[in-house]
Amino acid sequence: MNDDIEKWERGNGVRLLKKVGIESGQTILDFGAGVGHYAIPAAKIVGSNGLIYALDSDKHAIKELQRKVTRQELENIKLIETDGNLEIDLENSSIDVVLVYDILHLVDRREELYKQVHQFLRQGGLFSVYPKHNKLDSPGWGLENMTPQDIKKEIESYGFYFEGRYCGLLSHDNILNQGCILNFRKK
């Protein structure tokens, strides 16, 4: 892992996620957690009274995240390996925050994802999205024809209201680059 990413997981990521709205004691679902560039800083914020569900379909990423969790003695991260199916075994209204960071472009059935997120979130829960690879940010895959405004409207149509946008240095594929996070709340 490069030094920038290590610093990110130890400090800069923690500061950003606090700005985004993550707090001590929360239960968080990191959808597409990868090797934990967001799950690890989130775990440091929520502390021993909180819980992170780190979900991914990439077996290698899950193994690497498990190594990091063990090495850092993070007991509040629960790894969930999925086969890519959007059916996730979590209780309804049991999650405070859902992170969908740099993964939305890979989701074929976004409407199903939005419905699942809405189902899992508590009333007023935070749905935080980093829509990398949209029309204005390295276009590709399923978001290449959508602007952040289009994505905002799409998400709002599934029972969420827009809360705000946070821009800054974000983790993307083991490097840091400028990007923006869109925050929504469950109605």
What does each model-identified segment do?
Residues 58-60, 84-85, 131-137, 170:
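Short "lid" loop at the C-terminus of a central beta-strand within the Rossmann-like core
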Residues 43, 111-126:
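A short glycine-rich, Lys/Arg-flanked "PGG" loop and its adjoining helix->strand segment in the class I
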Residues 85-97:
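A short acidic, Gly/Pro-enriched loop at the edge of an enzyme's catalytic core
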Residues 158, 169-187:
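Core SAM-dependent methyltransferase catalytic element
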Residues 102-103:
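Short catalytic micro-motifs in class I SAM-dependent methyltransferases
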Residues 29-31, 35-86:
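Class I SAM-dependent methyltransferase SAM/SAH-binding core
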Residues 7-26:
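Conserved alpha-helix/loop element of class I SAM-dependent methyltransferases that forms part
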